Amino acid sequence: MADNPVLELLLRRLEVADGGLDSAELATQLGVEHQAVVGAVKSLQALGEVIEAELRSTKCWELTTEGEEIAREGSHEARVFRSIPLEGLVQSELMHLPSGKVGFSKAMSNKWIRVDKSAADGPRVFRVVDSIEDEVQKRLQLVQAGQAEKLAEKERNELRKRKLLTEVILKTYWVSKGKAFSTSVSKQEAELSPEMISSGSWRDRPFKPYNFSARGVLPDSGHLHPLLKVRSQFRQIFLEMGFTEMPTDNFIESSFWNFDALFQPQQHPARDQHDTFFLRDPAEALQLPMGYVQRVKRTHSQGGYGSQGYKYTWKLEEARKNLLRTHTTAASARALYQLAQKKPFTPAKYFSIDRVFRNETLDATHLAEFHQIEGVIADHGLTLGHLMGVLREFFTKLGITQLRFKPAYNPYTEPSMEVFSYHQGLKKWVEVGNSGVFRPEMLLPMGLPENVSVIAWGLSLERPTMIKYGINNIRELVGHKVNLQMVYDSPVCRLDIEPRSSKTQEAA
C-alpha cells in the first residue's frame, strides 16, 4: 500500500517495537497529525488480523487561544506591571492599554501596584515592587511542554477559572502485532468489476469483507414538514370515522360567510381591525345568495326561529367586506348551506384542515397565520351527549383518553364546551379544543329542517405538532427561522403514541 506512507511507517515501527505503539506518540515522532495515524490504524484493521488496536481514552490539558498568547507574551498583570514607568502612569491611560482592565485588578490583588488618588492629574498608578515573577506564564509554559502533572490541582483550577486552560479527552490507539502481521500488505478490493469477472483476475485478488453494521447512504429525496405529517394523521382519522373533506380553498372570505352567517353580530369585538385582516382590494364581495342574506338579516335585526335576535340595524355593506378568513367555520357554513339546498335532507359528516388568519400579537405560541382542524356532523336529533361521545372517539384515536368538558360561550353554538385533556408531562389539565351545537339562528335560515342538529368541534394543528415533536417556540416550526435539518430528521408521526419524553412535553 505504497500510496499511504503513514501506514508503511506504522508497520515498520511496529515490527521493531517491544509490545506495541501509542498512536499519539507515533504521530509526534513522525511529525504528522494524529488523525493521519488513526486513519492508517483503521485501514489495517479492515485487513483482518494484521494488527490489534485497543482504543484508550486519557484526560489531558490544553491551552486556550488566550492561554497560548499569555504563554508567549506574559500574563495581563505582568504586562500591566511592565508598562508602568518609575514615575507612575495615569490610571485612565493604563485602562486604555490592551491588557489594562484585566491586568490592573490582578496586579492590585498581587500587591504589585498601588493607586495614588491625590495626584494632580488624577489617580496615578505606581509600582510597589521592583521586579516580579510571572507565575501564570510559567505554569502555562509547563502545560505547553506536556508537563501539566507538575501543577497542583489548585493551580490548574485557577487557570481554568481564567479560561486559559481546558481539559480535553484524548482518544488514542494502543497498536500491537496481530496474528497475521506483515510489513507488506496489499490493498483489498472494494468492488467486483465486470473486467475482473471476464479476465478471471478476481480469483487472485483479496476482497474487503462486507461491513453489515455500516449505515447505508440516505436517499436523496424530499422531506415532509412536521405540520404536513401531523395533518396527514388527522386527515386519516377523520376518513376512518366516515367524514368527507370540505373544500377550503377560499382564503379570502366575505364578512357575511365568516361572521353574519354564523349569527355573529356586526358589533362583535372579533370583527374589529385589531383582530381581523380586512382587504383593501377587492374590498367587497359582489356575489352573495341574496335570499339567504335577507333571512340572515331578519334573524339578526328582528329575530325569528324562536329567537329575539340582536335588535340592531344590520348593514349589507358591512357583510360585503372582504377579509382573510379567521376560522374554517366559514367553510362549514358554506357546506351546510349547500347541504340544505339538497332535498330531501341527507345526514352528513364534514371535516377540514386548513389555514386561517388572525391579526394577533406574535409571540412564542401565536402567529398571524395558523391551521385549524374542524369536524361537523349534521343529523336528526343530535344532542350534547352525541357530541361528547364523538369527541371521546376522536381524541382516543389521537392517543388522548383522559378528557374533561367545561361549559363555554361561542356566538354560533349553544350549548358550547371547551375540551380539556390531562397532560402527563405538565401534570395538569390543558385545553385541547372547542366544541358545541350550532344554534338554530344559524341553521334554520340556511333551510335545514327544524329537527336537524349540527354538532361541531375544532382545534389547532400547530399545538399538537409542537407537543409531538418537542418544539417550544412556534417560530421554530413555521416561518423563516425554521431549521431545515429539523424537517429532514423529524420522524414519522403517530398520534396514538406518546411523545418522546416528559421533558419535551414540558418544553411544549
Curated annotation (Swiss-Prot):
Its main location: cytoplasm. GO terms for biological process: phenylalanyl-tRNA aminoacylation; protein heterotetramerization. Transmembrane segments: none annotated. The modification N-acetylalanine is found at residue 2. L-phenylalanine binds at residues 329, 372-374, 412, 438. It catalyses: tRNA(Phe) + L-phenylalanine + ATP = L-phenylalanyl-tRNA(Phe) + AMP + diphosphate + H(+). Coiled coil: none annotated. It comes from the Eukaryota. InterPro entries: aa-tRNA-synth_II (IPR006195), aa-tRNA-synth_II/BPL/LPL (IPR045864), Phe-tRNA-synth_IIc_asu (IPR004529), Phenylalanyl-tRNA_Synthase (IPR002319), PheRS_DBD1 (IPR040724), PheRS_DBD2 (IPR040586), PheRS_DBD3 (IPR040725), WH_DNA-bd_sf (IPR036390). The modification Phosphoserine is found at residues 193, 301. It is found in: Cytoplasm. Pfam families: PheRS_DBD1, PheRS_DBD2, PheRS_DBD3, tRNA-synt_2d. Keywords: Acetylation, Aminoacyl-tRNA synthetase, ATP-binding, Cytoplasm, Ligase, Magnesium, Metal-binding, Nucleotide-binding, Phosphoprotein, Protein biosynthesis. Mg(2+) binds at residue 414. Its EC number is 6.1.1.20. GO terms for molecular function: ATP binding; magnesium ion binding; phenylalanine-tRNA ligase activity; tRNA binding. PROSITE patterns: AA_TRNA_LIGASE_II. The modification N6-acetyllysine is found at residue 311. GO terms for cellular component: cytoplasm; phenylalanine-tRNA ligase complex. Its cofactor is Mg(2+). Heterotetramer; dimer of two heterodimers formed by FARSA and FARSB. Belongs to the class-II aminoacyl-tRNA synthetase family. Phe-tRNA synthetase alpha subunit type 2 subfamily. This is Phenylalanine--tRNA ligase alpha subunit. It comes from Mus musculus.
